[in-house]
Amino acid sequence: DGNAEEAAKNEAATYSLNAANSALDDVEDNIVATTPFTHLELSLGSDAFGLDTTGTTTKTELLGVLRLHETKNTFVFNQTSISSFDSRTTANLGFGVRHINDDETVIMGVNAFYDYELDSEHKRTGFGVELLTSLLEMRANKYNAVSGTITHDGINETALDGHDIKITGNLPYFYSSNIYFKQSEFKDGAGYKTENDEWGFEAEIAPNVTIGIAQQKDGNNTKDTVASIRYSIPLGANTAPTKAKQDGKWSTSLKPIREK
C-alpha cells in the first residue's frame, strides 16, 4: 500500500505515537460491528523524535478499510486515510484486491491510490503490487505526480514521480521480527533526483512495542545509521486476539498467513 510512503524529505521519518484517548476503543468497536468497515483507526500522537520543525508537534491520522466484496479467496477493499503532520494535511483514497490461495499460505495483491495535500494542493496517483508469505514479503509501488510546480508559503515545490520496492524476510523471534531491504527513487523531470537504499531490522519486543535499526545510503553514497522505537495501541484492542511470542524455530515451510 502507497499510503505510508512520503516522497523526498519524509523518506526516513519514524514516529513514536503515544495514545491520547483509550476510550475511543468503544467508538471503533460500534462502527465496525454495524458497517462494512473491517478496520478503523484513529491515532493521536506526539513527535517524540523532533522531526517536525514547524512547531506543530502532534501527528493525527484517521484510517479506515472498507470491505467492498469478499469471498473465501478474494478480498476487494477501499482504504481511505487523512493525516496531519509537519503543518501539512494529506488525504489518501485507495482501492485494492487481495487473493489468498486455498492453503492460505500465499497472498497476492494489487492496489491503486490517489494522494491530495490539502494545503499545497499537490496531487499524486500511484499503484502497487504485493506478494506475501510467512517467510518473505515483497512490495512495490509506482508514484505519478499529477500537479506540477506550486508556490506554497513562498517556496516553489514540485511533486515528484518515483517508485519504491521493499523485500522483507520474517524471523521467528519475539512477537514478530524481520530484516528488510528497501530501495526508492524520486525525480521531478527537470534533473533533480533523490535515491535511497535502506537495510534494516525490526523486532516487536513486547506487544505493540517495536524497535528498529537501519542503515541508509543516498545517491551520493552518504551513509547514516538510524534507530527507532514505536509504541502503538490499536483501537478496539479488546477484541483482538492476544499476541504470543514466536517459538524461535526456523522453518522453510510456508505457514498460513490469513491473520496478516
Model-derived features: where do they sit?
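Flexible, glycine-rich linker and terminal segments associated
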Residues: 1-34, 39-42, 145-180, 184-191, ...
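Transmembrane beta-strand segments that form the barrel wall of outer-membrane beta-barrel proteins
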Residues: 38-50, 74-84, 107-117, 127, ...
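Feature captures outer-membrane beta-barrel proteins of Gram-negative bacteria and organelles
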Residues: 58-71, 89-103, 125-142, 161-172, ...
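Solvent-exposed loop/turn segments connecting transmembrane beta-strands
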Residues: 48-60, 82-92, 116-123, 157, ...
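Outer membrane beta-barrel translocator domains of Type V secretion systems
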Residues: 3-117
